[in-house]
């Protein structure tokens, strides 16, 4: 009997040790870059990433690797196998013309589904445009998206009756739930979205996702604000929590109150905590260091874009705007030094 009891204790300790070992406290999250839209008048660079999304993830204890949308499939898949989750940020992308971007989106979606179906834990998060992308990928059509009058518009959420039992909301503190439900702290800034009616009539969507919150736009039309997958760690929101702590355009309807900051922090903490359950890792530390966002400099772009900071990438040279200018200056100085040395040599 004592031996049996000892065996039970041993198995219990081993199982808990394994559980502890599955928690990854050094998560690395990939954030997808985007092609420059016509609304951003930048004359160089072929990718960009708003710095607020990087800060959003870093504030919850994760590091960031940019996922360049125009990389080849093999390079992208290699990255996916080493990071612990992916964030699809908000932005402005024309799905009809940006073929390579949509191709990369599809690769991401197929990978996320495949590994999660096969028992790997690999979270995906979408914000604003990211929600539109996730529902379109699952519906296998961008036609599920509808026009909405929801730009520069802060409102409370209308939670569904299953929201508080959901993965994303069940551990949310009551004060944050009350703020989200009663205060205008969710900043919407989107032309498109998905209506509950479209969702309910699409089995690819309603069998895959649970709707946790909705809103009404300025014209009274209802759109979906918060969804999560029924079976996998896939989450999407239509509003911009990252704007509350990191965006300061005075004409934006962004709420910067303490409650809005708490709501943002809850969302970022939740997602990053989900990525801690992923056991992906970089086997080569040098590859990790070279991949991190720290290798790039954000550029202050408020005057041009009303967005404080943007990472500008030129994947043909792998430089940011700041790196590019520094290299140019360095090259000019080097040329001058060599020229002077040649003159002195022949004197």
UniProtKB/Swiss-Prot annotation:
Its EC number is 3.4.19.9. Keywords: Glycoprotein, Hydrolase, Secreted, Signal. The keyword Lipid biosynthesis does not apply. Residues 23-314 form the Gamma-glutamyl hydrolase domain. It is an enzyme of class 3 (hydrolase). Residues 1-22 form the signal peptide. Gene3D superfamilies: 3.40.50.880. The active site is at 128 (nucleophile), 240 (proton donor). GO terms for biological process: tetrahydrofolylpolyglutamate metabolic process. Glycans are attached at residues 152, 158, 201, 273, 314, 318. It catalyses: (6S)-5,6,7,8-tetrahydrofolyl-(gamma-L-Glu)(n) + (n-1) H2O = (6S)-5,6,7,8-tetrahydrofolate + (n-1) L-glutamate. Pfam families: Peptidase_C26. GO terms for molecular function: gamma-glutamyl-peptidase activity; omega peptidase activity. GO terms for cellular component: extracellular space; vacuole. It is found in: Secreted, Extracellular space. Its main location: secreted. Belongs to the peptidase C26 family. This is Gamma-glutamyl hydrolase B. It comes from Dictyostelium discoideum (Social amoeba).
């Amino acid at each position: 009997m004592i031996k049996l009891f000892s065996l039970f204790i041993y198995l219990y300790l081993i199982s808990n040790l394994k559980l502890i070992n599955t928690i990854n406290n050094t998560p690395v999250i990939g954030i997808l870059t985007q092609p420059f839209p016509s609304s951003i008048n930048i004359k160089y660079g072929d990718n960009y990433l708003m710095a607020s999304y990087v800060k959003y993830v870093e504030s919850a204890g994760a590091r960031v690797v940019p996922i360049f949308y125009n990389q080849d499939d093999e390079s992208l898949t290699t990255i996916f196998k080493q990071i612990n989750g992916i964030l699809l940020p908000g932005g402005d992308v024309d799905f009809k013309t940006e073929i390579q971007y949509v191709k990369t989106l599809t690769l991401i979606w197929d990978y996320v589904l495949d590994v999660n179906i096969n028992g790997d834990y690999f979270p995906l998060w979408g914000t604003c445009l990211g929600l539109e992308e996730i529902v379109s990928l699952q519906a296998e059509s961008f036609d599920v998206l509808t026009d909405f009058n929801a730009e520069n518009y802060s409102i409370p959420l209308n939670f569904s009756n299953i929201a508080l039992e959901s993965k994303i909301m069940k551990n949310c503190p009551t004060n944050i739930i009350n703020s989200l439900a009663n205060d205008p702290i969710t900043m919407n800034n989107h032309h498109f979205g998905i209506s509950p009616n479209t969702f309910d009539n699409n089995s690819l969507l309603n069998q895959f996702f649970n709707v946790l919150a909705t809103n009404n736009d300025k014209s009274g039309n209802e759109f979906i604000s918060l969804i999560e997958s029924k079976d996998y760690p896939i989450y999407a929101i239509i509003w911009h929590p990252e704007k509350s702590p990191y965006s300061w355009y005075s004409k934006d309807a962004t709420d910067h109150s303490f409650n809005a900051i708490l709501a943002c922090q809850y969302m970022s903490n939740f997602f990053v905590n989900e990525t801690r359950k992923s056991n992906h890792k970089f086997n080569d530390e040098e590859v990790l260091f070279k991949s991190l966002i720290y290798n790039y400099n954000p550029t202050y772009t408020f005057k041009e874009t009303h967005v404080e900071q943007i990472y500008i990438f030129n994947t043909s040279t792998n430089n940011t705007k700041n790196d590019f200018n520094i290299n140019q200056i360095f090259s000019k100085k080097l040329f001058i030094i060599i020229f002077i040395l040649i003159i002195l040599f022949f004197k």
